[in-house]
Amino acid sequence: MASGRLRPLREPTRCHRRVRQAPHGRAIDHPIAIEPTGGYEKPLLGALRAAGLPVETVHTSRFAAYRNLVGAKAKSDTSDARLLAAYAAAPDEVRGRKADHVVIAPDALREQLAELAARRNQLKHMIHAETCRLATVRNQDIRQEIAAHLEALRTAERNTHQAMMRLVRTRADLVNAKRLLQTITGVGDKTALILLALVPELGQISNKAAAALVGVAPFVRRSGTMNAPARIQGGRAPVRDAVYMAAVTASRHNRLLAPFYQRLIAAGKPPKVALVAVMRRLVVFANAVLKSAQPWKGAQLA
């Protein structure tokens, strides 16, 4: 499978049998590693899971760092396969993975929710792009075409949101998790759905890990005489965008976070830095309510 083309192979073949069972009857002692290919890997992931084989999608940047670590210069399908196998068998510290990392079990419903969340995000960006075009175009025919397209996009966005809501309502654990998240002042329907869809680790990891996953954990930059300001980096951008909007609301209306935001501003922090601090608090609160299965304690003050 490459460049959007799928080469079908007939079953059964000796090669396929070797995928289904370990060599010489031995158990597979580490997962089969697959490099992400923008979604083209999903059929293979599903087939391997259906066969009961351990499989994982590798972290792209960590795999690239591992390639540099071992000094691999060649780039071919065969060399990549060997390198992926070695990476899957490597210890956590070599893979850049924390010893207390959490492996999320496959969840078909959450995967559907994640696809809907990705689609809603795409529609949001298309709406923004078309709105910008409408502001600059003067030709009436083009304006009418863009306006009609915008209406269709907004309808599609609403339908996608409703589909996400319906999907969540089919499972009691997701209904309860969404309810708990929305006890946090500032977290509405859209933010709660994004957190459920794109951060399934919430409630099972530490607060520091949750902040790093979303990309709101500041990383220090100090070396020798250099003492640069800490900066956030990495993380899941669609989640961070959603939490940003929640933080804007929380910085004004949350009984705990609004004073916190004002204290940071009074201390001379730039507004964006103060807002990122609010974002981090929101992620910590979200992780805490899902871990404890209790409503947000600050809700008693709201």
Regions found by a protein language model. Name each.
Residues 13-31:
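Short, basic/hydrophobic alpha-helical segments
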Residues 266-302:
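Basic, amphipathic alpha-helical segments enriched in Lys/Arg and hydrophobic/aromatic residues
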Residues 1, 84, 193-194:
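Gly/Thr-rich phosphate-binding beta-strand-loop-beta motif of the actin/hexokinase/Hsp70
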Residues 189, 194-267, 271, 298:
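Phosphate-backbone recognition surface of nucleic-acid-processing proteins
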Residues 28-40:
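Short glycine-rich phosphate-binding loop at a beta-alpha junction
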